[in-house]
C-alpha cells in the first residue's frame, strides 16, 4: 500500500444535534495519508462553513489519532476497505484563566450545580467559599485537623470531613443554588432559619480514622470513605440518626483516643447547641483504607467505592451490603462515573485510569480500557458536564489531564501555572472539579486553586 497515492472509500456521519453540522450521506474517496486536520478540512468544505469548525474523528467508536494509512495497517485492512467515519466537535484547549492563593494545601473542591461559587477544604482545617475573582466569601472553622473532603448539599448547607474523623454539616448561603421542595421542607423542619451563616449544624461521628471522601445524593443522604476501612452512610435529616453522647465516648477507658484528642473533644463540647449524630449504618467489606466513595448518579440506593485493597465495590445502600467486588492489581485512589456509558473510571497508584462496566459479572477481571499518560498516582477524577465521553484527572505528577475515553492517550495536559511550583517538591494535584459555568478547577500541594477553561469548550 503506497501511502501518498492510495485512497480509501469513506462515508462521513455525525451524531451532533445541530443539523447545520450534518453532511450529505454520500460515500467518497480520500487519501489514506490524511490525519485529523485533513479530514476536518474535507468536512468543513462539505458543510460550506464560513468559519471552520475543528472536528475529531472516530472509526468503529475509536478516536483516530493517526493517519488513515496507519489505522488501516493497525487493523490489518487494505485500502479497498470501506470506512464509516464519525465526526464530532473537537474539544478546545483548556486555556488558563485564574489562580487563587490559599493558606495551606488544598485537598478538596466543589461547585454547586449551576453555581459560580467554589468551596475548598484545606490542610489548615478551614473550609472556604470563593467567588470567581478569588475573594474568600466565608470561612468555616471547627475541624481539629486537616480537611480532606467538602461537598455542597444545597444553597444553605454544605458538608466537610477530615483527619479528625468527623463530618460536619454547615449552614451556608449561596443564592446561586436552588432548594428542592424536599430540602426546603427539611430545613423548615429543622428550624435553621435562625442559625447564623458559617455555623456548624451537626457533627457526624462514627469513624475511627481520617475521613477522606464524601458524596451527597439528592435524597438527603451522605456517603463517607475512611481510612478505618469502612464507609459511613448518613442522613442530613437529624431525626433519622441516633444522638451521640460525647461524654460517653470520652470517659470510656476502652476507647483508644489520645490525650490530645480528648482535650480537643472537650473544647468542642463547650458549644452545647451543636447536634452530634451517629451514622445510619457503617458499610464494612474493604480490608484496607477506603479512598473514595460515590453514589450511582441514576440510582441513589447504589454506591461505589475504591480502596487501597485493590478493589472496586458496589453497595446496596438499602440493605447496607456489598453486592459486587472487582479485584485489580493495584491500589485504587479515585473514582468517577460515566453514567450514560455505564462505566466507572478508577484512578490508580499504578499511574493509569481503568474503565470498568459495573453491570458485567464479577466472575472475571473486567477492564474495558486503560488510559495511560500520568507519571504518578491518579488522585482525583471528574467528568465533563458537556460531553459524556470526556473526563479530567488530577495526579501527584503535578498535572491535570483531559481524556476522551474513546482513546487511550490524553487530549490535553494542564500544568501548574504558579512559578514557585517545583516539580516533585510541591506540585501534587489533590483535587479536580469540572464545573459548568466555571471550568476545570484544580488544587493541591502548591496552595493554589487554579481555573482552566472548561465551559463552552466545544463552541467556536
Swiss-Prot record:
The answer to whether keyword Nucleus applies is yes
Q: Which Gene3D superfamilies match?
A: YVTN repeat-like/Quinoprotein amine dehydrogenase (2.130.10.10)
Segments carrying the region annotation (Ubiquitin-like (UBL) domain) are: 8-89
- Can you say where the WD repeats lie in this chain? 101-140, 142-180, 206-244, 285-325, 327-366, 373-413, 424-460
GO biological process: what's one of them? maturation of LSU-rRNA from tricistronic rRNA transcript (SSU-rRNA, 5.8S rRNA, LSU-rRNA)
Which residue ranges does the record annotate as region Sufficient for interaction with ERB1 and association with 66S pre-ribosomes? 99-460
Which positions form S-S bridges? none
Q: Name one GO cellular component term.
A: PeBoW complex
Question: Keywords of this protein's UniProt record, alphabetized?
Answer: Nucleus, Repeat, Ribosome biogenesis, rRNA processing, WD repeat
- The question of whether rRNA processing is a record keyword is answered with yes
Q: Which PROSITE patterns match?
A: WD_REPEATS_1, WD_REPEATS_2, WD_REPEATS_REGION
Q: Which Gene Ontology MF annotations are present?
A: ribonucleoprotein complex binding
Entry-linked PANTHER family: RIBOSOME BIOGENESIS PROTEIN WDR12, WD40 REPEAT PROTEIN 12, 37
Recite the other comments: Present with 6670 molecules/cell in log phase SD medium.
Q: Whom does it interact with, and what assembly results? A: Component of the NOP7 complex, composed of ERB1, NOP7 and YTM1. The complex is held together by ERB1, which interacts with NOP7 via its N-terminal domain and with YTM1 via a high-affinity interaction between the seven-bladed beta-propeller domains of the 2 proteins. The NOP7 complex associates with the 66S pre-ribosome. Interacts (via UBL domain) with MDN1 (via VWFA/MIDAS domain).
Family, as annotated? Belongs to the WD repeat WDR12/YTM1 family.
Function (record text): Component of the NOP7 complex, which is required for maturation of the 25S and 5.8S ribosomal RNAs and formation of the 60S ribosome.
Q: What is this protein called?
A: Ribosome biogenesis protein YTM1
Amino acid at each position: 500500500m503506497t501511502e501518498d497515492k492510495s485512497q480509501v472509500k469513506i462515508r462521513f456521519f455525525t451524531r451532533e444535534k445541530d443539523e447545520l453540522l450534518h453532511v450529505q450521506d454520500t460515500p467518497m474517496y480520500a487519501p489514506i495519508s490524511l490525519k485529523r486536520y485533513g479530514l476536518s478540512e474535507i468536512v468543513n468544505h462539505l458543510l460550506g462553513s464560513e468559519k471552520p469548525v475543528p472536528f475529531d474523528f472516530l472509526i468503529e467508536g475509536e478516536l483516530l489519532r493517526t493517519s488513515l494509512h496507519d489505522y488501516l495497517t493497525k487493523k490489518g485492512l487494505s485500502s479497498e476497505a470501506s470506512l464509516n467515519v464519525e465526526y464530532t466537535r473537537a474539544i478546545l484547549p483548556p486555556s488558563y484563566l485564574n489562580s487563587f492563593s490559599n493558606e495551606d494545601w488544598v485537598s478538596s473542591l466543589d461547585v454547586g450545580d449551576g453555581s459560580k461559587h467554589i468551596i475548598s477544604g484545606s490542610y489548615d482545617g478551614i473550609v472556604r467559599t470563593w467567588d470567581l475573582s478569588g475573594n474568600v466569601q466565608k470561612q468555616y472553622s471547627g475541624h481539629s485537623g486537616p480537611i480532606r473532603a467538602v461537598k455542597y448539599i444545597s444553597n444553605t448547607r454544605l458538608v466537610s470531613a477530615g483527619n479528625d474523623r468527623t463530618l460536619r454539616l454547615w449552614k451556608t448561603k449561596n443564592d446561586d443554588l436552588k432548594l428542592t421542595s424536599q430540602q426546603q421542607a427539611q430545613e423548615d423542619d429543622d428550624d435553621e432559619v435562625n442559625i447564623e451563616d458559617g455555623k456548624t449544624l451537626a457533627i457526624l461521628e462514627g469513624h475511627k480514622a481520617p475521613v477522606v471522601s464524601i458524596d451527597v445524593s439528592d435524597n438527603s443522604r451522605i456517603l463517607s470513605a475512611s481510612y478505618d476501612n469502612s464507609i459511613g452512610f448518613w442522613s442530613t435529616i437529624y431525626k433519622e440518626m441516633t444522638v451521640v453522647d460525647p461524654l460517653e465516648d470520652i470517659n470510656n477507658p476502652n476507647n483508644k483516643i489520645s490525650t490530645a484528642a480528648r482535650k480537643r473533644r472537650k473544647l468542642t463540647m463547650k458549644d452545647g447547641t451543636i447536634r452530634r449524630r451517629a451514622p445510619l449504618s457503617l458499610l464494612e467489606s474493604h480490608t484496607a483504607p477506603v479512598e473514595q466513595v460515590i453514589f450511582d448518579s441514576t440510582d441513589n440506593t447504589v454506591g461505589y467505592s475504591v480502596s487501597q485493597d485493590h478493589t472496586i465495590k458496589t453497595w446496596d445502600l438499602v440493605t447496607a451490603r456489598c453486592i459486587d467486588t472487582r479485584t485489580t492489581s493495584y491500589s485504587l485512589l479515585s473514582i468517577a462515573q460515566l453514567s450514560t456509558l455505564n462505566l466507572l473510571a478508577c484512578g490508580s497508584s499504578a499511574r493509569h485510569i481503568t474503565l470498568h462496566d459495573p453491570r458485567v459479572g464479577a466472575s472475571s477481571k473486567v477492564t474495558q480500557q486503560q488510559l495511560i499518560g500520568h507519571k504518578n498516582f491518579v488522585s482525583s477524577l471528574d467528568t465533563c458536564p458537556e460531553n459524556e465521553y470526556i473526563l479530567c484527572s488530577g495526579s501527584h505528577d503535578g498535572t491535570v489531564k483531559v481524556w476522551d475515553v474513546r482513546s487511550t492517550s490524553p487530549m490535553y495536559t494542564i500544568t501548574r501555572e504558579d512559578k514557585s511550583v517545583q516539580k516533585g517538591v510541591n506540585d501534587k494535584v489533590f483535587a479536580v472539579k469540572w464545573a459548568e459555568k466555571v471550568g476545570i478547577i484544580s488544587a493541591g500541594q502548591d496552595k493554589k486553586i487554579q481555573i482552566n477553561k472548561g465551559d463552552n469548550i466545544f463552541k467556536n
